[in-house]
């Protein structure tokens, strides 16, 4: 056990030294702030979802409207060096309202199998950590070319969504879910390297950079929830059919 602990500690120190050699101190400091704000926003999201599920506070449609207003506000209310805490509060409010909108889905999933939520949460967390580390340890700027490609895929998916509102194709719906997971995974890699490049070019907007990553994480989590729920529903339907035979 001692040898294993020493090995893990040595590998961790090697990793930290590698980051120290690869990134300037101000970049490492900026990334630390971004990830701390991202974690706090995720906590606000969890709080909003829990309050909605427990019927302590349910903003309903107001939460959806608030998320739109807040994200537009963050986009147009640019960082000027003096409004950090105002924008940070807006980000936390956005996270909280996002949790409120997520609450009904989580409540439905709990009625089917609560373990789905933990599975989706674990999958999202492990994927985010793995891809973030991959982006940070990869060659600098290696994945920035993905930006244009990902925007094209997102636009195509949006058109397919409009198409599917009319034709109600189950195949299109499922394809969008699975493709969406891979697209969000690619966005995590792209946004991580893009944040580093922006920081080096003088853009130290912690709130906006945390928002970019939060979008990626939340979108992936939603899709994993739906995919796992659909699989569980199929299993339960098959079990019911087998019992009736």
From Swiss-Prot:
Q: What happens when the gene is disrupted?
A: RNAi-mediated knockdown induces autophagy in larvae under basal and fasting conditions with larvae showing an increased number of autophagosomes. Decreased larval survival following treatment with tunicamycin. Impaired pupal salivary gland degradation with pupae undergoing autophagy prematurely by six hours after puparium formation. Increased adult survival during nutrient starvation.
User: What GO terms describe the biological role, i.e. biological process, of this protein?
Assistant: apoptotic process; autophagy; calcium ion transport; cellular response to starvation; cellular response to unfolded protein; endoplasmic reticulum calcium ion homeostasis; negative regulation of apoptotic process; negative regulation of apoptotic signaling pathway
Q: Where in the cell is it found?
A: Endoplasmic reticulum membrane
Protein's recorded name: Bax inhibitor 1
Q: Which family does it belong to?
A: Belongs to the BI1 family.
Mind telling me which Pfam families this protein's record contains?
A: Bax1-I
Cytoplasmic face of the membrane = 1-30, 77-88, 137-142, 191-245
Keywords for this protein? Apoptosis, Autophagy, Endoplasmic reticulum, Membrane, Transmembrane, Transmembrane helix, Unfolded protein response
Top-rank lineage group of the source organism: Eukaryota
């Amino acid at each position: 056990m001692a040898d294993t602990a020493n090995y893990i500690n040595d590998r961790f120190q090697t990793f930290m030294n590698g980051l120290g050699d690869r990134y300037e101190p101000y970049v490492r400091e900026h990334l630390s702030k971004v990830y701390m704000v991202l974690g706090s926003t995720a906590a606000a999201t969890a709080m909003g979802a829990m309050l909605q599920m427990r019927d302590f506070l349910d903003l309903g449609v107001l939460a959806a409207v608030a998320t739109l207003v807040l994200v537009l506000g963050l986009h147009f209310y640019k960082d000027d060096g003096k409004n950090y805490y105002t924008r940070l509060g807006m980000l936390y409010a956005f996270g909280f309202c996002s949790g409120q909108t997520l609450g009904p889905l989580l409540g439905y999933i709990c009625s089917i199998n609560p373990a789905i939520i933990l599975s989706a949460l674990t999958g999202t967390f492990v994927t985010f950590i793995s891809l973030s580390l991959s982006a940070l340890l990869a060659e600098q700027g290696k994945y920035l070319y993905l930006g244009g490609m990902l925007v094209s895929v997102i636009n195509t998916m949006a058109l397919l969504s409009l198409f599917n509102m009319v034709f109600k194709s189950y195949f299109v719906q499922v394809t969008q879910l699975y493709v969406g997971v891979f697209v969000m995974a690619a966005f995590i890699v792209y946004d991580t390297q893009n944040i580093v490049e922006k920081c080096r070019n003088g853009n130290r907007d912690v709130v906006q950079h945390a928002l970019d990553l939060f979008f990626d994480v939340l979108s992936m989590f939603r899709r994993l929830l739906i995919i796992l729920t659909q699989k569980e529903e199929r299993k339960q339907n098959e079990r019911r059919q087998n019992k009736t035979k």
